[in-house]
Amino acid sequence: MAKISYSSQALADLERLSDFLSRNGLNTLETLDLIDEAVTIMTRHPLIGRQAESGLRELVISQGRTGYVALYSYELEQDAILVLAIRHQREAGFHAQIP
């Protein structure tokens, strides 16, 4: 089973999304649980996400008609996943420059 860790950018993204949801009266806990469940699936299926640029992968996390995207890297030798960033599908892009 792959180990999962979060970059400081991904943690900041979760906080930003949480703040947005709570300010707009949306169910923050339900959304964060949904993201957590999707990321946990990657422990058993680390290549589940679609290929992205620079050898990275994107996990699409559906929530009704919309959802979220988690950008991550997977290191086969270490069996380790690093979640680099998380955004809403309607956002134009990730909020930080990703190497």
Enumerate the language-model features and the residues they cover.
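Arg/Lys-rich, positively charged N-terminal/basic patches that mediate binding to nucleic acids
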Residues: 1-32
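GIY-YIG nuclease signature motif recognition
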Residues: 10, 35, 72
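Conserved amphipathic alpha-helical interaction elements at protein-protein interfaces in regulatory
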Residues: 16, 23, 41-44, 78
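Enriched for short, Lys/Arg-rich terminal
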Residues: 22, 29, 63-99
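Amphipathic, hydrophobic secondary-structure cores in small proteins
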Residues: 32, 56-59, 69
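A short, surface-exposed loop/turn module that caps and links secondary-structure elements
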Residues: 37-64
